[in-house]
Amino acid sequence: MYKMQLVACIALSLVLITNSAPTSSSTKETQQQLEQLLLDLKMLSKMVNNKDLKLPRMLTFKFYMPKRVTELKHLQCLVEELKPLENVLNLAQSQMSQLEHNGDLISNINITVLELKGSETTFMCDYDDEAATIVEFLNKWIIFCQSIISKRLDN
C-alpha cells in the first residue's frame, strides 16, 4: 500500500521538476532578448552621446536608478523610467533629426524588457538617493545587460 503512494509521490515530483526546469530554448531565447536589449540601449546611448547632440538641457534631466541591479526582476526599474526617458528624447528630437527613431527604440526596449521580466509587477524598486543623468542612466543599464549576458555564457 505504501509502495503505491511512494511511486505516485515520486512520479509527481518528477513531473514538477521537469515542468519547472528551464529548457535550453528558453535560455537561448532569454539570451537573444538580452542581446537585443543591449543593442537598443547602446543605440540610444550612441545617439545621446553624439558630438553634435550634446544638448545641455537634455543632460539636466535626472533619472532614478535602483541601488542594486543584478537580476532580471530589476528590469522593472527600467520600465518605470522609460516614459521620462522618452519625454527627454522627444524634447531633444525637436532640435536634432538624429533622434527621430527614438520612439521605436523605446517601444522595442519596453517590449523586450516585459518579455524578459515577465508579467509580474509586484517587485518594488529600491532607488538610489542620487539621480543620474541620461548618459549615466543608459550606461548603467548597458553594464547590467553585459553582466547578465556574461554570467549566462559562463554557466
Swiss-Prot record:
Secretion signal span: 1-20
Subcellular location: Secreted
Glycan-carrying positions: T23
Entry's Gene Ontology molecular function annotations: cytokine activity; growth factor activity; interleukin-2 receptor binding
GO biological process: adaptive immune response
UniProt xrefs under SMART domains: IL2 (SM00189)
Keyword Lipid metabolism among UniProt keywords: no
Cellular component, GO, one term: extracellular space
Protein family per UniProt: Belongs to the IL-2 family.
Protein's name according to its UniProt entry: Interleukin-2
Organism: Dasypus novemcinctus (Nine-banded armadillo)
Lineage summary: Eukaryota, Metazoa, Chordata, Craniata, Vertebrata
